From Swiss-Prot:
Keywords assigned: Iron
Lineage of source species: Bacteria, Pseudomonadati, Pseudomonadota, Gammaproteobacteria, Oceanospirillales
PANTHER family found in the cross-reference section: FE(2+)-TRAFFICKING PROTEIN-RELATED (PTHR36965:SF1)
Species whose genome carries this gene: Chromohalobacter salexigens (strain ATCC BAA-138 / DSM 3043 / CIP 106854 / NCIMB 13768 / 1H11)
GO MF entries: iron ion binding
An individual GO BP term: cellular response to oxidative stress
Protein name: Probable Fe(2+)-trafficking protein
């Protein structure tokens, strides 16, 4: 695996993930097409969604919802946001 990938979210070469973040073919696809930066940003959004929407990862519907939101995020489409979340000022 190379140290960089052409990131589908940012449309440029960025640092690669060191290992597939999910099992199976989906994890391999993500490792080959998503940068570490984009994955880290997705994980932060995922954490906010789980916490604010009180999602249980034991619930298949919640897992399907998160997979849908992940695809939307990585494809630069609109995603749900945690209610009341205000990003830190830069």
């Amino acid at each position: 695996m190379s140290d960089t990938v052409f990131c589908r979210k940012y449309q440029k070469e960025l640092d690669a993930l060191p290992f597939p973040p999910l099992p199976g073919a989906k994890g391999q696809e993500i490792q080959q097409t998503v940068s570490k930066q984009a994955w880290d940003e997705w994980q932060a959004l995922q954490t906010r969604l789980i916490n604010e929407k009180h999602l249980s990862l034991l619930d298949p519907d919640a897992r399907a919802y998160l997979m849908e939101q992940m695809e939307r995020f990585l494809d630069n489409r609109e995603t749900d946001q945690a209610e009341g979340y205000v990003p830190p000022s830069q």
